[in-house]
Amino acid sequence: SIIKLTASSTADSNRTVAHGLGVKPSFVLFRRTSNSAWFVWSAGLTTENNYLYLQDTYGVGALTQNANIWGNQSFTSQHISWRNSYTFSPNEELIAYVWADIDGYQKTGVYTGTGGALTVTTGFQPRFVMIKRTDSSGQWVMLDEPRGSGDNRLYADSNSEEHTGQGESFTSTGFRPRQTTTNDTNTSGGNYIYFAIA
């Protein structure tokens, strides 16, 4: 679901907007169109009011986690939410990209890094995967099949060129993070969220 709207003119108020999915979202990108800050929510984050920034490498603990970000309420099968004058300012133009898991097509999940061999099961062969470490800093790693079966990275938080030969791969039922101690996808004991699309 893609939602374009104008924030209410009422300051210091919790706001909601319908997303039309009929089920609770699993992954949300939300931003004002006049600013570079992308707020990210994932069902894989520790608590309902946690958030990350798509344009930065911060982990959850490096950001001031506050229930005001998402309007002091949980996302539901009907709406997403935010707080005017906290997350966004009154009368700003906003856009939200909202996804829900669909068996066999799309999945948001979590895994713990091993520093070695690891296979993450999604239940389908992905064509796109985005990965982010949440308990520490780490880049938003984007992998996709058209650019090389998951082996070539782009970073959502950076305008740097493609990084090739990184060692990730897709399987018929999921993906394999790089089999080293890289902080971005497979540090031993590291907590990661992912967003996969078939």
Description of each model-found segment:
Residues 1-198:
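Surface-exposed molecular-recognition determinants
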